[in-house]
Amino acid sequence: MIGPARALIAEDERLLREELREHLNALWPSLEIVAAVGDGKAAMRAIDAHGPDVLFLDIQMPGATGLEVARYASGRAHVVFVTAFDEFAVAAFE
């Protein structure tokens, strides 16, 4: 069983953002979604405002990419990248 945590979802596609929230609620009931935003700059502001433990980040977003958001949050939260683009897979781990 996974323990309680606070999470941020950053995904520019509204339907995908909502679907991810639903799946996370079903799979990890003790996870509190503190913010769900549609662009990278809003994600950075939400990190500062809410201090999430886990970030679920789309890689390709307006404002700032998920990679930029991950660098911004480095050391403050665990990062899970959510993307359908194969070409970003290697960059996400660098």
Description of each model-found segment:
Residues 1-8:
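Non-catalytic signal-transmission and effector/linker regions of two-component phosphorelay proteins
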Residues 11:
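Conserved acidic carboxylate
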Residues 18-26:
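Charged docking surfaces used in two-component/phosphorelay signaling
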Residues 28-34, 77:
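A generic structural motif
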Residues 34-41:
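Conserved Asp/Asn-Gly motif in the active-site loop of CheY-like receiver
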Residues 45, 49-94:
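CheY-like receiver
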